[in-house]
Every structure is written in C-alpha cells, then in structure tokens.
Design a protein with these regions (language model features):
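Acidic, carboxylate-rich catalytic segments that either coordinate divalent cations
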Residues: 263-302
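Compact, glycine/acidic-enriched structural inserts
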Residues: 1-21
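Sequence-pattern detector for short linear motifs
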Residues: 14, 24-25, 36, 244
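Terminal, positively biased "leader/anchor" segments
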Residues: 19, 23-26, 30
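Hydrophobic, aromatic-lined core segments that form the binding pocket/scaffold
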Residues: 30-274
Length: 302
C-alpha cells in the first residue's frame, strides 16, 4: 500500500530538485522501465523464431488489442503472420480479408456483397497459406470503447500497412513524433466505419489511428523495439535515436503524472518523464521499496 504522506514528501522533493538532477534521475528511471519492456520484446523475438518484423508486428497487434483483446491479437499475429501480411499488402481489401478472416471475425457480419467478396478472398488465402482461423469467441466485442474495437483496429492497421509497410526498417526511420504518426495514418473505409460495431446502428469512431494512440504506440512499441534491436545488434546509434524520439513525444497525462505534480510548474514534459514516474510509482512506491529507490541515492547524481 502506498503511503500518501510519503508520496507527498517525495513529490515536494522532486518539485524542488535542481532541473539537471531531475533530468538525470528521470532518465535512469526511464531506462529501468525500458529494460522491462525490451525483455518482453526479446521474449517475443525468441518465440517467433528470431524474426524482427514478426516481433514488431506481434508487439504492435497486442498493444492495439488493449486490455480486453491483447491476447487474442497476439494469437492472431501468429495465425496471419507478418510474412503473409507483407506479401499481400498491395490490396487493402486483401489485407482486410486476411486479418478479419484469420481472426474469425468475418463470420459475424451479415452477408452483403462486400462481406461475401472478403469471405471468398479469404477462402483462397486460407488455402494458399494453410490458415486455421481463430474462433470469434476469442474476442471481447461488447462493452468496449468503439475506438478499441478489434475489427476497427484491424482495418485501420490494414489501411496503414497497405499505404506503407510497417516494418523494423520503417520503425528505425522514425526520428520524430510526426514520423510515428505517419506510419499509422492509413484510413479505414466508410464501409467499416458504419458497420464494425455489431448491434449498434451508429457509432462515432475515427477512420485512422489518432495522434493520442500514435504517441502511445511510439512509447510502448516503437521505442522499446528499437532499444531491444539496438542492444541485440550492439548498435549504440540506434539506442541514441530511440532516446531522441522519446524526448519528442510529449508526457502522458494519467494518474501517475497527476499524482506527482506539485504546483503550477509541470515536472513531466516528455514521455521520458511520464514513463519515469510510472516506473517510480509501480516498482518502488507501490511495493514500499523506499530504501532501494533512486531518490534515496540522489546525492550520487552529479
């Protein structure tokens, strides 16, 4: 249990800390958090046969699945693999058929002309790649935010992948926040925007992955993958580039950043800072590891 009085004491301390020391402290905490994330990515890397594009794809789909459908998205990435997606990306409709058919989601939609066309296309793809589709029961489709609905996320991803290949190479080329947003700027068709949420007549949803989610993909997928690859390849330049990108992405605004804010001067400017505060809260404060916390070793920072 977090001691609120202790949090208040440390919050005041951080707000009064010399800016250069706070920057160093937050970078250390940020790197601790990155280490945890890159360990998870390296585990995925081993599970998928040490293939970096598949690793990025699996990590991305799992993140797009959010809390409710992350596991199902991860499973889908192994049914419709990156190699299949990359080979079929010339047609957006083909990618929709491959992803939604493999997910078992196509079967849920009424058989109008477009769905029949996608089902026919998927039958050819399933035979070509020997795909065994998932069950639709693997997915949570009700009582979720429309913008996190798996059908919408998959057709948004299909549109982005059709527009430009989402690969380790294109991720490595991201040096700014705008580069990350551009990577996911493909637009889902009006057809899906009007029909993706079964059981609802009209649902407000974005045609493409927005800047808010784009930032979170940068924080939780792109940057950790670049760090993992940089460590694996012993490429310090790539690690430095990932850190520069992290400084480009603004701070998250969540309960952790709010908890540590003191006064009117924000202490969390970039995602380096907000991720550092998450690491501080989850690893040290919530486990009462005050003696192990870097704040107690602040005098060692120069």
């Amino acid at each position: 249990m977090v001691s609120l009085s202790k949090i208040a004491e440390c919050r005041l301390f951080l707000s009064e800390l010399m800016p250069h020391k706070r920057i160093i402290l937050f970078e250390r905490l940020f790197k601790e958090r990155l280490y945890i994330k890159q360990k998870s990515i390296m585990q995925t890397f081993k599970e998928v046969g040490e293939e970096w594009n598949q690793t990025l794809y699996t990590t991305l789909l799992k993140y797009l699945g959010s809390t409710h459908n992350g596991s199902a998205m991860e499973q889908l990435s192994r049914v419709a693999t990156y190699a299949m997606i990359a080979k079929e990306r010339s047609e957006q409709r083909t990618l929709e058929a491959l992803l939604l058919g493999s997910a078992g989601l196509l079967e849920l939609y009424p058989d109008d002309g477009y769905i029949k066309m996608l089902k026919l296309e998927f039958s050819h793809l399933a035979a070509k790649y020997q795909i065994k589709p998932m069950s639709a029961e693997a997915w949570q489709l009700q009582n979720i935010y429309p913008n996190t609905h798996p059908t919408l996320r998959l057709v948004q991803f299909a549109a982005s992948m059709h527009r430009e290949p989402i690969s380790l190479g294109t991720a490595m080329a991201c040096s700014t926040r705008k580069d990350v947003h551009n990577l996911f700027s493909g637009c889902a068709s009006e057809y899906w925007l009007e029909r993706f949420y079964l059981g609802r007549d009209k649902v407000e949803a974005a045609s493409r992955i927005g800047s808010f989610t784009g930032d979170l993909i940068g924080i939780n997928v792109i940057i950790p993958t670049l760090i993992a690859n940089g460590l694996y390849m012993e490429d310090k330049t790539l690690i430095s580039r990932a850190m520069v990108l992290a400084r480009e992405i603004p701070s998250e605004n969540n309960r952790y950043t709010k908890m540590w804010q003191s006064g009117n001067n924000p202490i969390s400017i970039s995602c380096v800072d907000s991720q550092a505060l998450i690491q501080l809260s989850r690893t040290y404060c919530e486990n009462n590891l005050c003696e192990s916390c870097i704040i107690h070793r602040i005098d060692s920072i120069r």
